[in-house]
């Protein structure tokens, strides 16, 4: 998320904008697309083509594990979706909402590595205005985007809610919390989450104002699924206190992972990240 200048902060106090204005200032940094999707003549099969800016070029076997397609949201945008079959015997599929400055091309290699290590398939999507998705990134579009992804995951692949783990990272925790507050799933994982947009910009904010954006703090108590929160103690973008505050409001919290010394973008580089996910998916969920 962007740091606000002094003049922008003054403007925010004196002339409070609508939530959409806060959202666009704080949250959305879509990169130049790192991939394209090409449709065949039948209109039913899409092929992923990665640019040189993507983090990793795939082997044929790895590319065969990735299926991409487009789906339409309730707001009329077409969003790119990606299903990564990481494990033939996976019980769970992660519905993964990524961070604010990446797209599916950049994240896809991470999905392959993560899914194969925790024995889960991964379904992800690009927000409106990201990657091959049409439209513009807004808070309302975030909610419509994940709703369309959830519907596609359930109808196209026949995956039941009890086999879906809703996973959000950074700004991706916003649509994830919104969806999880409305639909029950196997579990919810919130990675470097924020409480609200105003609380990121103004750390001393104690309540949610009508012009606030991304009010996770007011929605998380509505989640009835188990919630695992992961946060770095030295997060320089979304302070560690956000993770703590959300944890305290959960109906069904599980043991959180506070990664000592980790920042905002390196939590997954610490060994305890994978260890905690493996334990949660393979052991704890069975008994919850």
From Swiss-Prot:
Which EC number(s) are documented for this chain?
Answer: 3.1.2.22
Q: Which family does it belong to?
A: Belongs to the AB hydrolase superfamily. ABHD17 family.
Spell out the InterPro entries in the cross-references. AB_hydrolase_fold, Hydrolase_4
What does it do? Hydrolyzes fatty acids from S-acylated cysteine residues in proteins. Has depalmitoylating activity towards DLG4/PSD95. Has depalmitoylating activity towards GAP43. Has depalmitoylating activity towards MAP6. Has depalmitoylating activity towards NRAS.
Any GO BP annotation: positive regulation of protein localization to endosome
The residues responsible for catalysis, as annotated, are: 170, 235, 264
Bilayer topology reads: Lipid-anchor
Q: What keywords would UniProt list here?
A: Cell membrane, Cell projection, Endosome, Hydrolase, Lipoprotein, Membrane, Palmitate, Phosphoprotein, Postsynaptic cell membrane, Synapse
State the Gene3D superfamilies in the record: alpha/beta hydrolase
From which source organism is this entry? Homo sapiens
Location of this chain's protein in the cell: Cell membrane; Recycling endosome membrane; Cell projection, Dendritic spine; Postsynaptic density membrane
Stated name of the protein: Alpha/beta hydrolase domain-containing protein 17B
What are the record's GO terms for cellular component?
A: dendritic spine; endosome membrane; glutamatergic synapse; membrane; plasma membrane; postsynaptic density membrane; postsynaptic recycling endosome membrane; recycling endosome membrane
Record GO terms (molecular function): palmitoyl-(protein) hydrolase activity
Name of the encoding gene: ABHD17B
Residues with Phosphoserine modification: 282
Which catalytic reaction applies to this protein?
Answer: S-hexadecanoyl-L-cysteinyl-[protein] + H2O = L-cysteinyl-[protein] + hexadecanoate + H(+)
Keyword Phosphoprotein in the entry? The reply is yes
């Amino acid at each position: 998320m962007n740091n606000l200048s002094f003049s922008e902060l003054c403007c925010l106090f004196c002339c409070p904008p609508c939530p959409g204005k806060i959202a666009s200032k704080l949250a959305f940094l879509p990169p130049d697309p790192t991939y394209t999707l090409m449709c065949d003549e039948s209109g039913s099969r899409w092929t992923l083509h990665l640019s040189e800016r993507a983090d990793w070029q795939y082997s044929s076997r790895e590319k065969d594990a990735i299926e991409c397609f487009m789906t339409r949201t309730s707001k009329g945008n077409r969003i790119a979706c990606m299903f990564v079959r990481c494990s033939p015997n996976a019980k769970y599929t992660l519905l993964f909402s990524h961070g604010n400055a990446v797209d599916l091309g950049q994240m896809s290699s991470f999905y392959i590595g993560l899914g194969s290590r925790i024995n889960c398939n991964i379904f992800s999507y690009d927000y409106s205005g990201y990657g091959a998705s049409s439209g513009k990134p807004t808070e309302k579009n975030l909610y419509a985007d994940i709703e369309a992804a959830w519907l596609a995951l359930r109808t196209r692949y026949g995956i039941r809610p009890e086999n879906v783990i809703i996973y959000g990272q950074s700004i991706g925790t916003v649509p994830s919390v919104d969806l999880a507050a409305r639909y029950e799933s196997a579990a919810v994982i919130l990675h470097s989450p924020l409480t609200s947009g105003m609380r990121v910009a103004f750390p001393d904010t104690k309540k949610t104002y009508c012009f606030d954006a991304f009010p996770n703090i007011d929605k998380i108590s509505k989640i009835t699924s188990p919630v695992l929160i992961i946060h770095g103690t030295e997060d320089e973008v979304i302070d560690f206190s956000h993770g703590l505050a959300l944890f305290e409001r959960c109906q069904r919290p599980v043991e959180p992972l506070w990664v000592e010394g980790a920042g905002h973008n390196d939590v997954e580089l610490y060994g305890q990240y994978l260890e905690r996910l493996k334990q949660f998916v393979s052991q704890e969920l069975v008994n919850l």
